[in-house]
């Protein structure tokens, strides 16, 4: 709010016709409402809540400021004295703010004057000069020196001497730019809001609005907002990182569980094959027709396979490839033995009948007769041999197989 806003009306013009009819200048009511609301003057226009004396918070600020400006212990300023003078001399808030401007000038231009004057005299003379500057002769607010002396308890000659000394220290420069008045008003509003908020322990909405307009508070709140924004960003990054870590952990655990549930690579179960190989051949009646040479040699080869089975289990799982098989042997003439019903060659009389503890194999030696260096009959071997089909076995072969089983599995 500037001086032009106070002098111009709502249409932006100011007419001199009928000037005496104006009770208030344009914008004066807004300024009065601002002072009443922010300087704790009250809102009751009809009772004692007027602008003709200082409010209690403003009086406290004035006492504190003048005691610091004039540290002389003689006639030290008290709040009771400020309230009495402001009530008797009708000190307005604008006169109070103008007096504060004068005291601030003295602090920079003539600090020696403030060291020799008491705080009570400084308050009285600064308020009197500010009132005379604002209210010209002939106005209703005009107060003469004798009235000021009676209000402050000072004789008129002493008051006149104090006035001359004050004007000399000010170098008779009493003009003040309206912007300085509003700067002092803003500073005074901030001091009152901060002091009253600390005294009560809480701040009103008006106090918060006043404090947010102060440059120092704006800087503090700005830095606080920056710190809160940084903290929010850090918390957001930490949250996103934790969520990503949790998702990655769940993926790894799921993958590991999937791999553990899958069957591991390895050799197949040989229980069924071993049981099939260890089972003895069940004798069956001899077919009427003559069997082929391959079927006849199957029963003889079963014993050799059973003996070489346990040795082949100890061989490495990855043996070298099998050598190429031998060429097939020429067919051999076989004869049926009438005594043991067993096929023999060369002679119709079976030598197994005379030698019960020996079994003579027929045909060429089987490649399974040697367990060392041969691949086990497993599906993943390079050239797995075909397992012989169970055929009819002789009585002697069955006896030898039972004897072998009792030797391997005693009891």
From Swiss-Prot:
Membrane topology recorded in Swiss-Prot or TrEMBL: Single-pass membrane protein
Q: Which family is annotated?
A: Belongs to the CNPPD1 family.
Highest rank taxon of the organism: Eukaryota
Q: Which UniProt keywords apply?
A: Membrane, Transmembrane, Transmembrane helix
Which GO molecular function annotations are given, in alphabetical order?
cyclin-dependent protein serine/threonine kinase regulator activity; protein kinase binding
Q: Which InterPro entries match?
A: Cyclin_PHO80-like
List, alphabetically, the Gene3D superfamilies matched. Answer: Cyclin-like (1.10.472.10)
Residue intervals passing through the bilayer: 231-253
Q: Where does it sit, as one GO cellular component term?
A: cyclin-dependent protein kinase holoenzyme complex
Q: Where in the cell is it found?
A: Membrane
Entry protein name: Protein CNPPD1
């Amino acid at each position: 709010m500037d001086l032009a806003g106070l002098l111009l009306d709502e249409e932006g013009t100011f007419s001199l016709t009928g000037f005496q009819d104006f009770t208030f200048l344009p914008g004066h009511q807004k300024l009065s409402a601002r002072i009443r609301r922010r300087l704790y003057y009250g809102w009751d226009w009809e009772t004692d809540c007027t602008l003709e004396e200082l409010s209690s918070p403003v009086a406290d600020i004035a006492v504190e400021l003048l005691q610091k400006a004039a540290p002389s212990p003689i006639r030290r300023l008290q709040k009771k004295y400020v309230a009495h003078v402001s009530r008797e001399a009708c000190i307005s808030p604008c006169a109070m703010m103008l007096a504060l401007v004068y005291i601030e000038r003295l602090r920079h231009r003539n600090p020696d004057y403030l060291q020799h004057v008491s705080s009570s005299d400084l308050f009285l003379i600064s308020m009197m000069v500010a009132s005379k500057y604002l209210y010209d002769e002939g106005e209703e607010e005009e107060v003469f020196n004798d009235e000021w002396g009676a209000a402050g308890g000072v004789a008129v000659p002493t008051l006149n001497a104090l006035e001359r000394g004050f004007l000399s220290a000010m170098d008779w420069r009493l003009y003040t730019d309206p912007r300085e008045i509003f700067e002092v008003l803003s500073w005074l509003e901030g001091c009152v809001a901060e002091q009253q908020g600390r005294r009560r322990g809480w701040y009103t909405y008006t106090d918060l609005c006043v404090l947010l307009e102060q440059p120092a508070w704006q800087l503090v709140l700005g830095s606080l907002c920056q710190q809160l924004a940084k903290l929010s960003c850090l918390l957001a990054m930490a949250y996103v990182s934790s969520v990503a870590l949790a998702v990655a952990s769940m993926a790894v655990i799921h993958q590991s569980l999937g791999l553990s549930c899958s069957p591991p690579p390895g050799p197949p179960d040989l229980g069924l094959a071993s049981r099939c190989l260890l089972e003895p051949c069940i004798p069956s009646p001899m077919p009427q027709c003559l069997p082929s040479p391959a079927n006849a040699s199957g029963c003889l080869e079963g014993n050799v396979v059973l003996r070489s089975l346990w040795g082949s289990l100890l061989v490495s799982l990855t043996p070298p490839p099998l050598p190429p098989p031998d060429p097939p042997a020429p067919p051999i003439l076989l004869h049926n033995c009438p005594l043991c019903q067993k096929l023999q060659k060369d002679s119709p009389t079976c030598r197994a009948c005379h030698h019960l503890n020996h079994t003579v194999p027929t045909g060429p030696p089987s490649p399974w007769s040697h367990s060392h260096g041969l691949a086990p009959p497993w599906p993943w071997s390079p050239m797995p041999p075909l397992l012989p089909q169970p055929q009819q076995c002789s009585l002697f072969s069955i006896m030898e197989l039972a004897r072998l089983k009792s030797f391997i599995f005693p009891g």
